[in-house]
From Swiss-Prot:
Binding-site positions, Mg(2+): 175
EC top class, as a word: lyase
Subcellular location: Glyoxysome
Name by which UniProt lists this protein: Isocitrate lyase
Gene Ontology CC terms: glyoxysome
Chief localization: other
NCBIfam families: isocit_lyase
PROSITE patterns found in the cross-reference section: ISOCITRATE_LYASE
Amino acid sequence: MAASFSVPSMIMEEEGRFEAEVAEVQAWWNSERFKLTRRPYTAKDVVSLRGSLRQSYASNDLAKKLWRTLKTHQANGTASRTFGALDPVQVTMMAKHLDTIYVSGWQCSSTHTSTNEPGPDLADYPYDTVPNKVEHLFFAQQYHDRKQREARMSMSREERAKTPYIDYLKPIIADGDTGFGGTTATVKLCKLFVERGAAGVHIEDQSSVTKKCGHMAGKVLVAVSEHINRLVAARLQFDVMGVETILVARTDAVAATLIQTNVDKRDHQFILGATNPNLRGKSLAGALAEAMAAGKTGAELQALEDQWISMAQLKTFSECVTDAIMNTNATENEKRRKLDEWMNHSSYEKCISNEQGREIAEKLGLKNLFWDWDLPRTREGFYRFKGSVMAAIVRGWAFAPHADLIWMETSSPDLVECTTFAKGMKSIHPETMLAYNLSPSFNWDASGMSDKQMEEFIPRIARLGFCWQFITLAGFHADALVVDTFARDYARRGMLAYVERIQREERNNGVDTLAHQKWSGANYYDRYLKTVQGGISSTAAMGKGVTEEQFKESWTREGAVNLGEEGNVVVAKSRM
């Protein structure tokens, strides 16, 4: 007879620690922070994926700060407004005036990839590109925070009272594109973001294979269920790391024209099908393949596709049913009754499948309805998709339980679209926070808005619930504008262009890069040198002879310098 197994005390202790941590995670999830969050996994799943060495992350402090900031704006009907930062100079200047920082994948793609190979925003750069930029900026934030503390603690109380304190540690929200692949790629990307300093991450519902900038053509969506998997993967990774990183779900459904698959019934009502029975059995992909086999290329293939699409009379299934009802010989009252019945059964929030839709259509007497969503599929196999604000709302409803903010990408700054989206979201998820891209891809002057309306745009949509608003590429455009205009003037007028455009403007506006040695932290590291060497150093960078002393004096345009009769520089008496 086998001896009974006696559980060693070490095993019991291990299980005790595990169960205690599970209870801790469950209590964390029950907090106000996660009251709207749905998870398809358990606290035990999360703890099982953790190692035994507990770690903490500085980005988590900023994530909690970001949450408080956004919830305050939401409660007040205001918005955190920010833009894409390119470098440490921009991020430190932004800290004086804005309460969040954005890191754009577009800007990284064009100016700072891991391989240093620039290109358009196709998310084809290495997946550590944006996390690397986040770290670049986060290190700068921490450095300037340390530098400021050293400077302030070197002042008297009176001096500190007169010197504004700058919060350099503004939370960073970063571009996670599509998650860069499958579930494990998304998990690893999110881990990198947390480690590198991101307080928030946004992930979009485009296909990772065909990903485009939100304002390019040819966007392909993934199924609603696939994007939910991405969001769940991100949340799971944050939970495993024990962080409260903000998760933003973006949808490109407004302008998308294609979708990878018809596997999710929530997408069915927006997929287009051919309604011309003369094309039965004559798919677009087949027609193009035959044309290519016959030697046709380029413009000929495009003309063939355009002709086929025109003949197909593409419609959603609901449009097909509606048109069929209106074309029957029934009385107007009977048509109206059938239309009302159809709309009652097929309203957007019900997300009926195509199979369910066909059953309802047959009950309404439409038994031989021709509608085929496979015929117009592209050569790559994608289905045709009818993008709209309503499509974005339906996706927003599905994403909201798995994200902290919902972002609808748009093609223009349209107040009506914003209002429709906000009302649609709030009808199902009234507490969900919304985000808006104040894109520089929009020609704002062509929007029809007056200057006053442009000025009021941010606060107006903030009152609708868009509590985080950002100009993705303002850092890029500001950089280009300043350098282009200065370079042109410098080529023409030399040093006067620099003095007038840069140095005097820095002085007049109190920009701290005027004293760039101090801004870069020379004083801070002098403190290190002196501390190491007992309080004195003959090699201190900011010691006697540093030219930055010139900026401490009161210079005037008239009294600073003048030229003698022989053209020699004569220093004003105040400097002698």
